[in-house]
Curated annotation (Swiss-Prot):
Cellular component annotations (GO), alphabetically ordered: cytosol
List of residues binding ATP: 30-37, 149-152, 178, 186-189
Alphabetical UniProt keywords: ATP-binding, Cytoplasm, Ligase, Nucleotide-binding, Pantothenate biosynthesis
Entry EC number(s): 6.3.2.1
Record-listed (R)-pantoate binding positions: 61, 155
Main subcellular localisation: cytoplasm
Protein's recorded name: Pantothenate synthetase
Reaction equations catalysed: (R)-pantoate + beta-alanine + ATP = (R)-pantothenate + AMP + diphosphate + H(+)
Misc. comment: The reaction proceeds by a bi uni uni bi ping pong mechanism.
Complex formation: Homodimer.
UniProt entry tagged with the keyword NAD: no
Length: 283
């Protein structure tokens, strides 16, 4: 696998592949890779002739009191994992390469409405940072396909909307959440949890499963949410949000909706965890 910080190197290699009529899939990451990321790379490998990955801890999507400096950097381990998974080209730019004028002078991309809800309300400016860097990476790599995890459901929706609104010729693929044996969604931030906290955090998946069954049984949304909030609090969580929304348009769920998504964000200690579950009801 070739690793480079050079935009021109990335473009030259992708151009060479394209001249041979070959396709390119792209997996953007922030590094500190786990099995969830590797699953994305393997999925990308099944969908295109070549896989490009990136590792960039994007300062634009971190808030003032968030963990940018503490975010783990594990490049050597990540390179080995990406090579084993089948990636052929790795882009590892610095902030100065991505934002040569500095972030304050950077043209940005903002997806209205959905960027201000849920994680966007808790983390103002977060999705502007995500959309801007993903748009820039797409322009650098120019992939046919880009692969993302569905654990970040709102992020995936923001990216799909951006691609559609800006008429980008890129297929966006969402991959099911990969979980630890306990049911806890794999996340780089799980490394901040103690063994006891990890055990407590597995309550998220149990509550999501219970909520899904209650939705299928026709129970009232408000009652379902209240019960789950109680369960999570008893497990040691501090609630950020727990909502049921229409999975297609992200509106607050209505009784007539068929495809729903349950979205949760909660703190275990100082670590913020997110998860979701899509539920399809009988029409």
């Amino acid at each position: 696998m070739i690793t480079t910080q050079s935009i021109s190197d990335i473009r030259a290699q992708v151009k060479a592949w394209r001249q041979k009529g070959e396709t390119v899939a792209f997996v953007p990451t922030m590094g500190n890779l786990h099995l969830g990321h590797i699953t994305l790379v393997k999925e990308a490998k099944t969908r295109a002739d070549h896989v490009v990955a990136s590792i960039f801890v994007n300062p634009m999507q971190f808030g003032q009191n968030e963990d940018l400096d503490a975010y783990p950097r594990t490049l050597a381990e990540d390179q080995a994992a990406l090579t084993a998974a089948g990636a052929e080209l790795l882009f590892t730019p610095t902030p100065e390469i991505i934002y040569p004028k500095g972030m304050d002078a950077q043209t940005y991309v903002e997806v209205p409405s959905i960027s201000d809800l849920l994680c966007g309300a808790s983390r103002p400016g977060h999705f502007r940072g995500v959309a801007t860097v993903v748009c820039k990476l797409f322009n650098i790599v120019q992939p046919d396909i880009a692969v993302f995890g569905q654990k970040d459901f709102q992020q995936l929706l923001v990216i799909r909307t951006m691609v559609d609104d800006l008429s980008m010729p890129i297929e966006i693929v969402g991959v099911d959440t990969i979980r630890e044996a306990s049911g806890l969604a794999m996340s780089s931030r799980n490394g901040y949890l103690s063994a006891e906290q990890k055990d407590q955090a597995s309550q998220i998946k149990r509550s999501l499963d219970k909520m899904a069954e209650s939705l299928k049984a026709g129970l009232a949304f408000k009652d379902i949410i209240t019960q789950a909030q109680t369960e999570l609090a008893e497990a040691g969580f501090r609630n950020d949000y727990l909502e049921i929304r229409n999975a297609n348009n992200f509106a607050i769920a209505d009784a007539g909706d068929v495809k729903l998504v349950i979205l949760v964000a909660a703190y275990m200690g100082s670590t913020r965890l997110i998860d979701n579950q899509v539920v399809t009801l009988n029409a």
